[in-house]
From Swiss-Prot:
The lineage of its organism: Bacteria, Bacillati, Bacillota, Bacilli, Lactobacillales. It catalyses: epoxyqueuosine(34) in tRNA + AH2 = queuosine(34) in tRNA + A + H2O. Its EC number is 1.17.99.6. It comes from Streptococcus pyogenes serotype M1. This is Epoxyqueuosine reductase QueH. HAMAP family: QueH. Catalyzes the conversion of epoxyqueuosine (oQ) to queuosine (Q), which is a hypermodified base found in the wobble positions of tRNA(Asp), tRNA(Asn), tRNA(His) and tRNA(Tyr).
């Protein structure tokens, strides 16, 4: 499988990298070699899963990895996890794809320890970089454990997230593990606009903050109301059993 470093090695080191173009070049190599790689793609919510799945399922087998201990409160975390699974299930039914869903443990105290001392950082600052690293590291670890060809992140679809930073982090994480990072800039080529269209098509809940308690407070988000709304949404839902048909299975065992 092609490594992004093979492409970067042929570029001018002073040239700004267009990660969307790099991803397209990698996809062309897969097609030329008649391979369909397996990708463990970190997603933070259903909206960021939309166009990313529509695009990548043309070339690869995707498992979405919901690793988001940064999301607060817990009820909101459960809501986003549920809506993501609901979208994946409906996307598969509509398109004939077989995208799978895998969820990491929810350990918010671990996230809080990671960003200690960065609580007052502005959105897009050092706290965000640490958060990207924390979640991409978990994704890479799981990709190695389960034998995926690549790990990736759907975060680059957001116009509020710095794709350069996310890709820099992904490249650094790749150096630590025996797996490959798939770079991206999913917002390019009208990717973000398409994600908004798909949210309307699938009637997807679009949250008003990234999930981080610190960013939410800076934005003036009413977390009490968020918790109340999430609780009401989940009241008649069965998070454990409603979407077992899309859960990732490894050697025949559901994870």
């Amino acid at each position: 499988m092609i490594d992004l470093q093979e492409i970067l090695a042929n570029m001018n080191p002073n040239q700004k990298i267009n990660y969307d173009r790099v991803m397209q070049q990698m996809a062309k190599v897969w097609e030329k070699e008649s391979v369909r790689p397996s990708i463990l793609m970190h997603v933070c919510c259903a909206p960021c899963s939309t166009y990313t799945l529509e695009y990548l399922t043309q070339f690869a087998d995707i498992t979405v990895y919901f690793a988001n201990s940064n999301i607060h409160p817990k009820d909101e975390y459960h809501r986003r996890a549920y809506v993501t699974q609901q979208f994946v299930s409906e996307f598969n039914a509509k398109t004939g794809n077989t995208v799978q869903f895998l969820e990491a443990d929810y350990v918010p105290n671990e996230y809080v320890r990671q960003v200690r001392g960065l609580e007052e950082e502005p959105e897009g600052g050092d706290r965000c970089r640490v958060c990207f690293d924390y979640r991409l590291d978990k994704t890479a670890q799981k990709a190695v454990e389960l034998g995926f060809d690549y790990f990736a992140s759907a975060l680059t679809i957001s116009p509020h997230k710095n794709s350069q930073t996310i890709n820099d982090v992904g490249i650094d994480v790749q150096k630590v593990y025996t797996t490959k990072y798939l770079p991206s800039d999913f917002k390019k080529n009208n990717g973000y606009r398409r994600s908004v269209e798909m949210c309307e098509e699938y009637d997807i809940y679009r949250q008003c903050y990234c999930g981080c308690v610190y960013a939410a407070k800076m934005q003036g988000i009413d977390l009490v109301q968020v918790k109340k709304d999430a609780k009401a949404f989940m009241a008649d839902k069965d998070l454990d059993n409603d979407f077992t048909h899309i859960r990732f299975s490894y050697r025949g065992d559901e994870m």
